[in-house]
Swiss-Prot record:
GO annotation (BP), single: generation of precursor metabolites and energy
Protein name: Bacterial microcompartment shell vertex protein EutN
Additional information: The need for a bacterial microcompartment in EA metabolism can be bypassed by increasing the levels of EAL and an acetaldehyde dehydrogenase (not necessarily EutE).
Described purpose of this protein according to its UniProt entry: Probably forms vertices in the bacterial microcompartment (BMC) shell dedicated to ethanolamine degradation. Expression of eutK, eutL, eutM, eutN, eutS (eutSMNLK) in E.coli leads to formation of a single BMC. Coexpression of eutQ with eutSMNLK permits E.coli to make cells with more than one mobile BMC, as is usual in vivo. It may be involved in transporting positively charged molecules into and out of the BMC. The ethanolamine (EA) catabolic bacterial microcompartment (BMC) probably concentrates low levels of ethanolamine catabolic enzymes, concentrates volatile reaction intermediates, keeps the level of toxic acetaldehyde low, generates enough acetyl-CoA to support cell growth, and maintains a pool of free coenzyme A (CoA) and NAD.
Keywords recorded for this protein, A-Z: Bacterial microcompartment, Virulence
Protein backbone atom coordinates (compact mmCIF):
# COMPACT_ATOMS: atom_id res chain seq x y z
CA UNK A 1 0.00 0.00 0.00
CA UNK A 2 1.35 3.42 -0.93
CA UNK A 3 2.08 5.99 1.78
CA UNK A 4 -0.72 8.44 1.06
CA UNK A 5 -4.25 9.14 2.30
CA UNK A 6 -6.96 6.63 1.37
CA UNK A 7 -10.73 6.44 1.65
CA UNK A 8 -12.25 3.32 3.17
CA UNK A 9 -15.46 2.05 4.71
CA UNK A 10 -15.38 0.30 8.09
CA UNK A 11 -16.65 -3.27 7.70
CA UNK A 12 -16.08 -4.58 11.23
CA UNK A 13 -13.94 -4.80 14.36
CA UNK A 14 -11.04 -7.05 15.28
CA UNK A 15 -10.83 -8.28 18.88
CA UNK A 16 -7.40 -9.30 20.18
CA UNK A 17 -7.01 -9.92 23.89
CA UNK A 18 -3.28 -10.52 23.51
CA UNK A 19 -1.41 -7.94 21.42
CA UNK A 20 1.74 -5.85 21.15
CA UNK A 21 1.97 -3.30 23.99
CA UNK A 22 2.12 -0.46 21.44
CA UNK A 23 -1.44 -1.38 20.41
CA UNK A 24 -2.81 -1.93 23.91
CA UNK A 25 -5.41 0.83 24.10
CA UNK A 26 -6.70 1.29 20.56
CA UNK A 27 -9.49 -0.32 18.61
CA UNK A 28 -8.66 -2.39 15.53
CA UNK A 29 -11.00 -2.07 12.55
CA UNK A 30 -11.54 -4.08 9.36
CA UNK A 31 -11.71 -1.61 6.48
CA UNK A 32 -12.31 -1.92 2.75
CA UNK A 33 -10.69 0.63 0.46
CA UNK A 34 -13.08 2.62 -1.75
CA UNK A 35 -12.84 5.14 -4.57
CA UNK A 36 -14.31 8.67 -4.48
CA UNK A 37 -17.72 7.30 -5.51
CA UNK A 38 -17.73 4.72 -2.72
CA UNK A 39 -17.04 1.73 -4.95
CA UNK A 40 -14.97 -0.94 -3.18
CA UNK A 41 -11.65 -1.78 -4.81
CA UNK A 42 -11.48 -5.25 -3.24
CA UNK A 43 -8.61 -4.40 -0.90
CA UNK A 44 -9.32 -5.11 2.78
CA UNK A 45 -7.01 -4.25 5.67
CA UNK A 46 -6.81 -3.78 9.43
CA UNK A 47 -6.44 -0.21 10.70
CA UNK A 48 -5.85 1.14 14.18
CA UNK A 49 -8.51 3.59 15.37
CA UNK A 50 -8.19 6.00 18.27
CA UNK A 51 -10.97 8.38 17.17
CA UNK A 52 -14.03 6.13 17.45
CA UNK A 53 -15.14 5.17 13.92
CA UNK A 54 -17.95 2.65 13.63
CA UNK A 55 -19.11 0.00 11.20
CA UNK A 56 -20.44 1.48 7.95
CA UNK A 57 -18.67 4.82 8.35
CA UNK A 58 -16.40 6.24 5.67
CA UNK A 59 -12.95 6.97 7.06
CA UNK A 60 -9.74 8.66 5.98
CA UNK A 61 -6.60 6.54 6.44
CA UNK A 62 -2.86 7.07 6.35
CA UNK A 63 -0.24 4.35 6.04
CA UNK A 64 3.44 3.75 6.67
CA UNK A 65 5.41 6.24 8.75
CA UNK A 66 2.47 8.67 8.59
CA UNK A 67 0.36 6.06 10.40
CA UNK A 68 2.97 5.66 13.14
CA UNK A 69 3.13 9.44 13.59
CA UNK A 70 -0.67 9.70 13.72
CA UNK A 71 -0.73 6.91 16.29
CA UNK A 72 1.58 8.93 18.57
CA UNK A 73 4.43 6.44 18.59
CA UNK A 74 7.23 5.70 16.17
CA UNK A 75 7.76 2.43 18.05
CA UNK A 76 4.26 1.00 17.54
CA UNK A 77 3.91 -1.67 14.85
CA UNK A 78 1.23 0.37 13.04
CA UNK A 79 0.97 0.49 9.25
CA UNK A 80 -2.58 1.84 8.77
CA UNK A 81 -4.33 4.43 10.96
CA UNK A 82 -7.77 6.07 10.90
CA UNK A 83 -7.24 9.85 10.97
CA UNK A 84 -10.75 11.07 10.19
CA UNK A 85 -14.42 10.15 9.92
CA UNK A 86 -15.80 11.45 6.62
CA UNK A 87 -18.86 13.71 6.71
CA UNK A 88 -19.16 14.41 3.00
CA UNK A 89 -17.45 13.68 -0.32
CA UNK A 90 -17.96 15.88 -3.38
CA UNK A 91 -16.51 14.58 -6.67
CA UNK A 92 -17.04 16.15 -10.07
CA UNK A 93 -19.29 18.79 -8.53
CA UNK A 94 -21.70 16.17 -7.11
CA UNK A 95 -22.20 15.04 -3.54
CA UNK A 96 -21.44 11.32 -3.67
CA UNK A 97 -21.52 10.75 0.08
CA UNK A 98 -23.14 12.58 2.96
CA UNK A 99 -23.27 11.23 6.50
Amino acid sequence: MEADMKLAVVTGQIVCTVRHQGLAHDKLLMVEMIDAQGNPDGQCAVAIDSIGAGTGEWVLLVSGSSARQAHRSELSPVDLCVIGIVDEVVAGGKVVFHK
